[in-house]
Regions:
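Short phosphate-coordinating micro-motif centered on Lys-Gly-acidic
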Residues: 80-86
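Basic amphipathic alpha-helical segments that dock to polyanions
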Residues: 240-241
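Glycine-centered, phosphate/nucleic-acid-interacting loop/turn motifs that mediate DNA/RNA or nucleotide
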Residues: 245
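Short, Lys/Arg-rich nucleic-acid/phosphate-binding segment
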Residues: 250-254
Length: 254
């Protein structure tokens, strides 16, 4: 079976299919929110309970948070949201699209450290050292809401519920890291890939997608980098899953 650059696990048209931009580079666009044209606010966002859960905030508190999240940024596929070493200023809530985070070794090799989808936060890596420790790259045309961290921190000191929710987000990241350590330290290749696919299904299902269909925006090489597997091993494992009837591969569809 030939290695495809991207896998899709779906049998129906999917609005998140990557666009081919011909390798062109684009200047980042930071767009101010215009309430009369396209209101983007935490209080009316259908991803708010996934991104920064604010269900316990009062109406006035939500309005303060809406003022804080006052801009968004559009990125093309392959564009960097931030890179390792950049000053840490903001968190980024993924509104649409898909990202990967990666770190580079001294010999120039890239290691994928995570994949982020709509409703998840990017930039938490920069809190400790006031600089980002990884690159964040858009895997498809994407959009993020910009959350200035200093202002969020100040607002959290005023609103205990917001502070509590932010602590829960940090805890969730720690639990995720523990899960990755378990994945890499004790599982065979088949178990790693199966756990990876199931995790994506669960996260997408929380966003309203089917539990039996999945879209992969990353290449097999990127999956292998994340799972600590060689490209050939990832390809063989996908082939084995298909032979055993666990999934069906048809070009970009699985």
């Amino acid at each position: 079976m030939k290695a495809a650059p991207v896998f899709l696990i779906t049998r129906k048209p999917e609005p998140w299919r990557p666009q081919n931009n011909g390798g062109m580079s684009f200047t980042p666009a930071v767009l101010p929110i215009n309430a009369t044209e396209f209101k983007v606010a935490c209080s009316n966002c259908n991803l708010r309970e996934l991104c920064l859960p604010v269900g316990g905030l009062s109406e006035p508190e939500l309005e303060r948070l809406d003022l804080l999240v006052a801009s968004r940024r559009a990125l093309r596929r392959g564009e960097l949201l931030f890179r390792s070493g950049d000053p840490f200023e903001s968190l980024y809530a993924v509104r649409t699209g898909f990202f990967k985070t990666r770190v580079s070794s001294k010999d120039g090799r890239d290691q994928v450290t995570g994949f982020q989808m709509a409703g998840e936060l990017l930039g938490l890596d920069g809190i400790g050292a006031d600089r980002h420790t990884c690159d964040a790259v858009a895997l498809e045309d994407s959009q993020v809401c910009i959350i200035p961290y200093g202002q969020l921190e100040a607002l959290s000191r005023e609103f205990s519920e917001l502070q509590r929710q932010f602590h829960k987000i940090m805890s969730r990241e720690i639990v995720r890291d523990h899960g990755v350590m378990l994945l890499l330290g004790s599982m065979r290749a088949e178990e790693r890939l199966a756990a990876f696919l199931l995790n994506l299904v669960q996260r997408l299902h929380a966003r309203g997608f089917s539990q039996s269909e999945l879209v992969l925006r990353m290449t097999r090489e990127e999956i292998g980098s994340y799972l600590g597997l060689k490209l050939e091993t990832v390809s063989r494992t996908f082939s084995r899953f298909q032979e055993e009837g666990f999934l069906e591969v048809k070009q970009r569809d699985i």
